[in-house]
Amino acid sequence: MIRQHVVRGGTAPVALGLLLLLGCSGKSDIIPMNLVPKGGKEVAGSVQTVKPMPGPRVAVIPFEDARADRARVGSRTSMWGGETDFNVSSGSAGEETAQAFVDYLKRKGWQAQYSKVAPAAENGPDIVLSGKILELAVDAKRGFLLTDIEARTKLVIQAKNREDESSIVRTDAHSGNHDNVFWFDPQDGEGILSEVLEKNFERFVMNTRFEDRSIRFR
């Protein structure tokens, strides 16, 4: 579980504070949210791939979204009651989660590729990764000048081996928060949601190992 505390910015004029408080979004507003943050030097460096290591070929297919509201991934609320929904920018949390998983695996040296559908067994990948989204949300609560951000994820990840048709399944849940953010930007929400989402991927990788062309639990 991630627990972070950050303070951004400094003292601001009272007039600016009043503008921030009065500029509350209405309940009908929607902000698009990327599960893999776009832009920024820090983000660009984090998605750098490494040379693939020898091992099985892995395909990641879109996750099943088991949430009641599949478009929504949280909200921003103000101290005056205004609310803005965060929606998945592409419209599919399952696809973006799978693509984020592929990015993570490539950074770890896996021979991983995203596939829109499950590949055919013949001449296909050695391992197919899929999953289910049980929880995926980031909520930003604005107080007087400062905003607290909390992200929560719960994923089921399944790996199916082509060689013997065996499979393994793991479920993980993680949360994290950034408190007292002075000037909230949607990228702040994207960043922490991405961090928490990757904790699920990290746990899966840490608790599995390759055995020839298959994947097993450690």
Where are these regions (language model features)?
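Generic short beta-strand segments
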Residues: P62-R67, K132-V138, S175
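Bacterial N-terminal signal peptides
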Residues: A12-L21
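Short secondary-structure boundary motifs at beta->alpha junctions and helix caps
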Residues: W80-S92, K160-S214
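N-terminal secretory signal peptides that target proteins for export/translocation
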Residues: M1-V7
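A structural "domain/chain start" motif
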Residues: C24-A98, M206-R218
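Short acidic, glycine/proline-rich loop/turn micro-motifs
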Residues: R72-G74, A140-F144, V181-P186
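Amphipathic alpha-helical segments
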Residues: E96-G109
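Surface-exposed short loop/turn segments
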Residues: S25-G39, K108, S115-S167
